[in-house]
Amino acid sequence: MSYNRVNGQPAKLHREQFQPLTFDQADKKADSVLTLMTTDEKISLVGGDRSFFIRPLPRLNLQEVYMSDATQGVHIREKFRDIDLSKYQLEKSTSFPAPISLAATWNPELSYQYAEAVGEECRAGGIGILLGPGTNAYRQSQCGRNFEYFGEDPFLRAQMIKEYVKGVQSTGTVATLKHFVANNTDYYRRRSNSVVDERALHEIYLPAFKAGIDAGAKAVMTSYNLLNGEWCGQSETVINDILRKQLGFRWLVMTDWWSVYDGEKLAKSGQDLEMPLAVALKHADSLIQDGKVEVSDINRMAKSILRTYFSMKFDEMKRDTSYYGNFEDHERTALQTAREGIVLLKNDGNILPITEKSKTILLTGDYVDKLAVGGGSAQVKGYNNRLMIDELKK
């Protein structure tokens, strides 16, 4: 069951908490379906469909699964490159304070409720996989995606992300830890090489991912960058050795969009799903014929997708618009996050020349008359937005 944790209010029951199938239960169901699939069907499954979907297989009664960004709420994307996505979109979605603000609350319980609300909004839109939380370290202030992340401190990130994962997945929505790993800049992000030694990797970059994995995260997205000279999305060192063996991750691994280049390396790396479609694996059948990729490699990839699919009961999932009834709770959670994340400085020594007699205050800057929000795939527009200048005039 899920609870209202804001402001220490009494626990408020919304509905029964989602219970996934165990690894062994899901593995057994995946095996039973895999034996019925043709090689062509397996190849089609390991490449994304229409940019944001796990491909459906109607012959085997497997429905499509829609994915959506991001960490601070649901990005409403009605259309993308002539692909109609309106079937899976919300009438509105709550724009929560950025995760960097959530981290500033130092409140893991609030992280749970924040994420639970995001998960409920995913369910209202029929979204099975949330492409968040952003789990990277805030290493460079120039990184344009820092607002999606939980700061620079490994311990704080780990504590907040652990509860975030639990909150999202309590609703039956998959949480996706991203971007694995050491993805600290978006400048030349497809060519950026993060050179990181073992100690720094394990002390700074991995703890938050490990916490999310231990909390039960069902998906990990690999990153655009190279780690020590290897593209993360097709690196056996990154995926098989670090993610799967060292961190113990056993569920779905997907690429970031258009981030892999070598189908043979991808199939051998431990990667499962190439997004947004099969590019490196476009000619997987030829790679198999040439002996560069084994059918067993494709079987492993397809089985991992199916295992996650069945664990999260996507074969039973339906859009649940009754969650719109919880949006007022979500608004209160967003407000509480903003309140707890604020750092208020006292005006000692009258550093700001404002007194009780002051009648006029100059408010200037780019965001006086518009909202300060992060952009790109993580942007959440929200609704009933209020501008700073309008509030100060009241």
Spans of model-derived segments:
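Glycoside hydrolase catalytic-domain context in secreted enzymes
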Residues: 2-394
